[in-house]
Curated annotation (Swiss-Prot):
The protein's name: Austinoid biosynthesis clusters protein J
InterPro entries: Fungal_Meroterpenoid_Isomerase (IPR050977)
Additional comment: In A.calidoustus, the austinoid gene cluster lies on a contiguous DNA region, while clusters from E.nidulans and P.brasilianum are split in their respective genomes. Genetic rearrangements provoked variability among the clusters and E.nidulans produces the least number of austionoid derivatives with the end products austinol and dehydroaustinol, while P.brasilianum can produce until acetoxydehydroaustin, and A.calidoustus produces the highest number of identified derivatives.
Family: Belongs to the trt14 isomerase family.
Pathway entry: Secondary metabolite biosynthesis; terpenoid biosynthesis
Assembly behavior: Homodimer.
Species: Penicillium brasilianum
Name of the gene this protein is made from: ausJ
Function: Part of the gene cluster B that mediates the biosynthesis of the fungal meroterpenoid acetoxydehydroaustin. The first step of the pathway is the synthesis of 3,5-dimethylorsellinic acid by the polyketide synthase ausA. 3,5-dimethylorsellinic acid is then prenylated by the polyprenyl transferase ausN. Further epoxidation by the FAD-dependent monooxygenase ausM and cyclization by the probable terpene cyclase ausL lead to the formation of protoaustinoid A.
Recorded superkingdom: Eukaryota
C-alpha cells in the first residue's frame, strides 16, 4: 500500500488523487480480480511491457482480460505490493506516478519472486490509469518461463501477459 504519511492539508489535491489511484492500481494487482483491475483503468488504457529481452509490446484491456485466467491458473499463492514507498515519485503536471513493486508467488512450477517499476499515467481527472509502463527483472522471469516450458505450460502469444514473448496480432 502506498504510504499516506503526507498530511492531506499539505498535499495538493492532484497529488492526493494520483497517489490514491496508484494505490488502487496496486491493490487490484494483488487481488487478481479482473473486474477490479480493469475498473481502475480507463477504457483505452494501454499496458506497455518494456523489457527488450522479451520484446517490447503493448496490450489493451481486452487482451489483459484474455490473458489473466491462464496466468491465474499457474498461481497457488500470490502477493504483490509496493517495495519501497520512499521511491514512489509523483509528477503532478504529467499526471504520472512511478512505483517500485515486488511480487512473491507460489506457482505450479515453484516459487516466483520479482521486482518491478511501474510508471502510471492517469486520466485528466486523475481517477483512472490511462497508460502503464512496466519494467521487470527479465532474468527472474526467464527462469520462470523455462520452468513453465519444462512443465508444458503454454507460453508465447497465447500465454499470460508476463510470459508473452511476441506481440499478438491485435497488438501490432
Amino acid at each position: 500500500m502506498l504510504s499516506r504519511s503526507h498530511s492531506n492539508a499539505t498535499m495538493s489535491t492532484t497529488r492526493h488523487r494520483l497517489l490514491a489511484t496508484a494505490s488502487r492500481f496496486v491493490e487490484t494487482l494483488e487481488s487478481l480480480d479482473m473486474d477490479a483491475m480493469l475498473a481502475v483503468r480507463s477504457s483505452t488504457c494501454l499496458h506497455h511491457m518494456c523489457c527488450p529481452s522479451f520484446r517490447n509490446y503493448s496490450i489493451t484491456n481486452d487482451q489483459t482480460r484474455e490473458a489473466l485466467p491462464q496466468w491465474k491458473a499457474t498461481i497457488k499463492k500470490y502477493k504483490f505490493g509496493v517495495l519501497d514507498d520512499s521511491q514512489t515519485l509523483v509528477d503532478e503536471q504529467a499526471r504520472k506516478v512511478m512505483i517500485r513493486a515486488e511480487t512473491a508467488a507460489e506457482t505450479t512450477v515453484g516459487d516466483y519472486n520479482n521486482e518491478y517499476v511501474f510508471i502510471l499515467r492517469m486520466t485528466e481527472d486523475c481517477n483512472a490509469v490511462d497508460e502503464i509502463w512496466e519494467f521487470y527483472d527479465t532474468i527472474r522471469l526467464r527462469d520462470l518461463r523455462h520452468r513453465l516450458e519444462a512443465g508444458h505450460v503454454p507460453i508465447g502469444v497465447d500465454a499470460p501477459a508476463p510470459f508473452t514473448t511476441t506481440a499478438s496480432p491485435a497488438a501490432l
